[in-house]
Design a protein with these regions (language model features):
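Cytochrome P450
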Residues: 1-428
Length: 428
């Protein structure tokens, strides 16, 4: 079994500002900090560097409470992501927050509109659609593993883990191949605007640039598809209605941004984290090779372990008590999903990477009404890429340091250099 540094709680930083510092998320040990908070104050009042306070929720029970009661905890009033600075907390300056407060994107809607919008989009992510898509995903996975083996050495993040989900979502959306690199670059910038490798100027400027670029692209493409709709996801956006009213251009563009950006994060980062842990824990790799049935439970442990979406922001719509604390209407609450997924009261040996973990009620895909629309697709991709990996890869090892993305929203990877060896082929 593999254990990480978060299992040892020592020398903890005292400054709660670390909770939203993108560079601490990249290089620090947040799991140690969260473990202490779960013990001492799982509902804890915290100040941002720009003076706005919020309730920090770190226990599984409290995070799940937020998901199970979308009426009391609004995703729309102030958006669903904790702003990094005062500018990003100002809807006059932040395009993403302004659109969020309009309910332009699916995850930033409250009932009943959230359910209506979700039903308008979900066809491409239902079991029947995924069954039809599976041969494409399987062939893609085999090709990516084959290309990796042909190189011998590669950057697993950008050569495999990022290409798998981006190619799949671009296929579902029927994005022209010549535009993939542009959209991938803008998605990285929008998801991690504070990372110097992705950002371009200030955090606010980088985020606004990315959103504007992808929105404009999706809106223009949707106008073309509306005239002659097909079976692709852009055509769905172009022709969808909510309560009989067509989506606005902003709603089409912002949901397109969601599919392009968020559609990549879970698989890319869970897969990289999972492979990294299998390298560090050869007993788990041997266990998987001896029992391929573990491919059914492995995807959820990959997601639990990394928790690609670290948190969601909610706004209290009424006065209430939560975890012994008095919450007032209008208060912000930040539910730390990554902390909930290591809660010692829910998961046996939570700091142990266990590909056969059962049960595994992690919240990495959200829960209830806000269960990730692409959750089943992410599981399919992880299962298929690992099937191809087991079939074709004999050995994999790190050849350098793993580099993490500087983001307080997504627990991501930038680079993971590896060396791989192909399995010997037996010729009858």
């Amino acid at each position: 079994m593999s254990r990480d540094a978060g299992s040892e709680v020592a020398a903890l930083p005292q400054d709660d500002h670390d909770l939203i510092d993108p560079h601490f998320h990249a290089d620090g040990d947040l799991h140690a900090l969260w473990a202490r908070h779960r013990r001492e104050a799982p509902v804890r009042w915290t100040q941002t560097p720009y003076g706005r306070g919020y309730w920090s929720l770190t226990s599984y029970e409290r995070v799940r409470d937020v998901y199970l009661n979308p009426v009391a905890f609004s995703s729309q009033r102030n958006g669903a992501t904790l702003p990094l600075n005062a500018q990003m907390a100002d809807p006059e300056q932040s395009q993403t927050l302004r659109l969020a407060m309009k309910g332009a994107m699916l995850p930033q809607n409250d009932p009943p509109r959230h359910g209506i919008m979700r039903r308008a989009f979900q066809r491409h992510f239902m079991p029947k659609a995924l069954q039809d898509l599976e041969p494409f995903v399987a062939n893609l996975a085999t090709d990516l593993i084959g290309e990796m083996l042909d190189k011998g050495e590669c950057d697993f993040v950008n050569d495999v883990a990022a290409r798998l989900p981006s190619t799949v979502i671009f296929e579902i959306m029927q994005i022209p191949r010549e535009d993939w690199d542009f959209l991938f670059e803008m998605a990285n910038r929008g998801s991690a605007p504070a990372d110097p490798d992705y950002g371009n100027g200030s955090v606010l400027e980088s985020r606004n640039q990315a959103v504007k670029a992808i929105l404009g692209y999706i809106i223009d493409l949707a106008k073309c598809r509306r005239a002659s709709p097909g079976d692709d996801l852009i055509s769905v956006l172009a022709t969808a209605t909510v309560d009989g009213v067509p989506l606005t251009d902003e709603e089409i563009g912002y949901n397109g941004f969601m599919f392009v950006a968020a559609g990549q994060e879970t698989t890319r980062n869970s897969l990289t984290a999972g492979i990294a842990q299998l390298i560090k824990a050869p007993d788990q790799m041997q266990r998987l090779r001896a029992n391929p049935d573990l491919l059914q439970t492995l995807p959820d442990e990959f997601v639990r372990w990394r928790s690609p979406l670290t948190h969601v922001l909610r706004t209290a719509t009424q006065d209430m008590e939560l975890g012994g604390q008095r919450i007032r209407e209008g208060d912000w609450l930040v539910a730390w999903i990554a902390s909930a997924n290591r809660d010692e009261t829910v998961f046996a040996d939570p700091f142990t990477f266990d590909i056969g973990r059962k049960p595994n009620p992690h919240l990495g895909f959200g829960a209830a009404d806000h269960f990730c629309l692409g959750g089943l697709l992410a599981r399919l991709q992880l299962r298929r890429i690992m099937t191809a990996f087991l079939e074709h890869v004999e050995d994999i090892e790190l050849t350098g340091a793993i580099e993490n993305v500087a983001s307080h929203q997504f627990s991501g990877f930038k680079r993971m250099p590896v060396r791989v060896k192909a399995r010997s082929r037996v010729i009858a």
